[in-house]
């Protein structure tokens, strides 16, 4: 195992547990793991009535889910019509929302196909991001995306996928009063209706729970590890591209690595030619 950073806390920027709000990934996941909290939110976003929702993998609702590309932090549920919903908070603009949305839709479909279902059985799906920023800069509360013909705008593909991005600081567009109050609460304002007061009480209840405090520490540790893997996998990708063009001494300067770190990376690359950067980074950091 090698240390990627001289200061092991360099990638740790997690709030103290007591300071968490509904917009923090962990708190959002815990609060929304209760159907009575999540169902009204989905109903207000989509302007529909949902009879009931359930979580296919209940134990993973607020877990940090690792996959080949990193970490998923979404709340995943289905309703009585087998419609799938993936909803996530996004506090900072990482400028990757379109690709992240595409990836989530793909994962929803692959999860069904991996179980042996025919593609005709693919479920209607919504991927929803609630953002503490305006990704498109128009001031809208909501941006809704469906696949549509460019030549004939009135023709929709009808693949039953829909993507929605919400802006908690929005002021443009017509949304229902319930959703407006919810977005205002998520932007930091005082809860002003029954639902937001329920959410606020749920947040306070989580903070009083020692189990959730311990789980948050585990969550923070896993996120720190994932961040380190992401950084190192990018370095490994770059090293693979340039190692034939530069000396090892040059690469030490280019990538800001120690001799031990660079040697470990090169040795692991050579020993595992079939592994991708993410797998190699995990070996280097945690072997």
Question: What annotation goes with each model-predicted range?
Answer:
Residues 1-162, 172-174, 225, 287:
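Accessory alpha/beta interaction modules
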Residues 169-171, 198:
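C-terminal regulatory or interaction extensions
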Residues 166:
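Hydrophobic residues at beta-strand termini and immediately following loops
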């Amino acid at each position: 195992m090698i240390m990627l950073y001289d200061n092991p806390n360099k990638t740790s920027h997690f709030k103290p547990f007591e300071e968490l709000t509904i917009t923090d990934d962990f708190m959002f996941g815990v609060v929304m793991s209760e159907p009575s909290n999540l169902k009204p939110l989905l109903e207000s976003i989509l302007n529909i009535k949902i009879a009931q929702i359930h979580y296919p993998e209940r134990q993973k609702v607020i877990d940090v889910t690792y996959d080949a590309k990193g970490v998923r932090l979404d709340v995943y549920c289905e309703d009585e019509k087998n419609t799938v919903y993936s909803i996530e908070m996004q506090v900072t603009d990482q400028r990757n929302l379109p690709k992240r949305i595409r990836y989530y839709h793909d994962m929803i479909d692959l999860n069904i196909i991996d179980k042996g279902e025919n593609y005709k059985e693919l479920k209607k799906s919504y991927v929803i991001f609630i953002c503490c920023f305006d990704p498109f800069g128009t001031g809208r509360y909501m941006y809704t995306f469906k696949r549509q013909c460019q030549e004939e705008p009135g023709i929709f593909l009808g693949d039953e996928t829909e993507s929605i991005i919400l802006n908690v600081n929005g002021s443009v567009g017509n949304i229902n009063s319930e959703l407006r109050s919810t977005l205002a609460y998520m932007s930091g304002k005082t809860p002003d209706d029954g639902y937001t007061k329920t959410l606020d009480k749920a947040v306070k209840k989580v903070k009083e729970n020692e189990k959730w405090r311990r789980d948050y520490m585990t969550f923070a540790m896993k996120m720190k590890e994932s961040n380190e893997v992401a950084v190192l996998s990018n370095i490994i990708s770059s090293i693979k591209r340039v190692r034939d063009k530069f000396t090892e001494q040059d690469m030490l300067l280019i990538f800001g690595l120690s001799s031990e770190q660079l040697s470990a990376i090169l040795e692991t690359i050579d020993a595992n030619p079939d592994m991708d950067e993410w797998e190699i980074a995990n070996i280097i950091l945690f072997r």
